[in-house]
Amino acid sequence: MDHAVVRSWSREFSDAAIPLTSSQLMRQHLEGVRLALPFDAAQVLVFDRSKDVHRQIVQVGYPAEVARALAEDFTQNWPSPVWYPVDADDDLPTSISGERDVDGSFRRSHIYRDYLAPAGFLDGITLELKHRGRYVGLANFSSRTLGFYDRSRRLVSAAFATLLAQAISDNARELEAIPPTAHAARVIR
């Protein structure tokens, strides 16, 4: 066997053994999601229970100020502003272009008006990520095309909410910045 081939295999397997950070792993997950749920920009936020805040773990395609507004301002009063679907019986994630344009709707919020729309994002969805019933974070997806997140894409997005929540849960200690020496305790009063 050629010595160069063995060395090449060795490098390939040794590189694969180097663990990815949670951010790198989530970036890979987002790129995988993009194949079935296209987006111009996306962001995954983890809910840090120890500080009662959302923290961005990865974002792709958003200008820095838009990503900051989504991570900090948008999550401050989550789940407000409430999104108002056109069809009240539709339990899929609501898209920006698929919601009613009424007072209090997301399209009239300062997040959309001051950040997303000026950056050219005309449609988007937010997925609430839950693992085993526990809220673990949010995933934001945006498109520059009005009406992009139609019913079929929203249906696909619902499946990815579960997978992204699982990925967050698998890395919870690192993502929530919980010290490895921390232990849970149950207090009964």
Where are these regions (language model features)?
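Signal-transducing coiled-coil/dimerization helices and immediately adjacent hinge/linker segments
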Residues: D170-R189
